[in-house]
């Protein structure tokens, strides 16, 4: 970053529509949130027990202009004051992504602004920069509905995925187990709440995989829970949902936290970041804080709940980093539902 760039304020509008939240935000200098507007569609998807892509896209089309206008108004800035427009280009639902990408392209073209395509997971990681300055090398544990990854970073924009899920993401497992327990969608917060009322007394598997692997696997655990519930029902017995929630969460959290701390030791990082929607989970936050006591010299950064779930402030922050590195997209930018991080 040059001297001139350091002295000039940088204002970036972020836009996020990768799944079921329509979001826009204005961030100053990659550190100060001037506005962060999120229109959630949760109620529309709840009765279906999951996100319906077609419904998500329609809601984004209805909301996108209003959400962007509100973000600009709350921030008290004009389009003339902006330095760039950053938008989630992937991964996500293709129809949902297209709404945000096309809105960003239209704004960039109309106002002569640089356009920046941002990876959704990079956004989740960079949400932490709104809490603390990033110190490299660092390790990020990204846990969301569709992703469970350990990402090592040597410097800004340099991502190495050292561990990822081989089947279900942690968030998917939460939703499927919640459904089996008769809990509403989205299941994560409900399991977290029940887990705090129960004890992890049910013996459930933990998939450590082969020695030295930082990958994750949650499908076996999910199947074990579903089988236990099914077998109990066949026998005419009832399993206390609080004990099952506590046991399931203990298994997920144990593997996530143990592998994260092992990797932090091996890669000799200065900082560990928690990122993604499941990062809002109280059980995970508490367990990671406790286990990180083994590494007193490593800083643990956990974003506030509002920055864990999908939002556009994180996209604006990641976009600011790319802007300052001179990286730009052109008007051929397209939505990529399976965009790789690396």
From Swiss-Prot:
InterPro entries: ATPase_NBD, Gcp-like_dom, KAE1/TsaD, Peptidase_M22_CS, TsaD. Substrate binds at residues 142-146, 175, 188, 192, 281. Fe cation binds at residues 120, 124, 310. Its EC number is 2.3.1.234. The keyword Secreted does not apply. This is tRNA N6-adenosine threonylcarbamoyltransferase. One of its GO terms (cellular component) is cytoplasm. The keyword Zinc-finger does not apply. Required for the formation of a threonylcarbamoyl group on adenosine at position 37 (t(6)A37) in tRNAs that read codons beginning with adenine. Is involved in the transfer of the threonylcarbamoyl moiety of threonylcarbamoyl-AMP (TC-AMP) to the N6 group of A37, together with TsaE and TsaB. TsaD likely plays a direct catalytic role in this reaction. Gene3D superfamilies: 3.30.420.40. Keywords: Acyltransferase, Cytoplasm, Iron, Metal-binding, Transferase, tRNA processing. It is an enzyme of class 2 (transferase). It comes from Geobacillus kaustophilus (strain HTA426). It is found in: Cytoplasm. The gene is tsaD. Belongs to the KAE1 / TsaD family. SUPFAM superfamilies: Actin-like ATPase domain. The lineage of its organism: Bacteria, Bacillati, Bacillota, Bacilli, Bacillales. One of its GO terms (biological process) is tRNA threonylcarbamoyladenosine modification. Coiled coil: none annotated. Binds 1 Fe(2+) ion per subunit. It comes from the Bacteria.
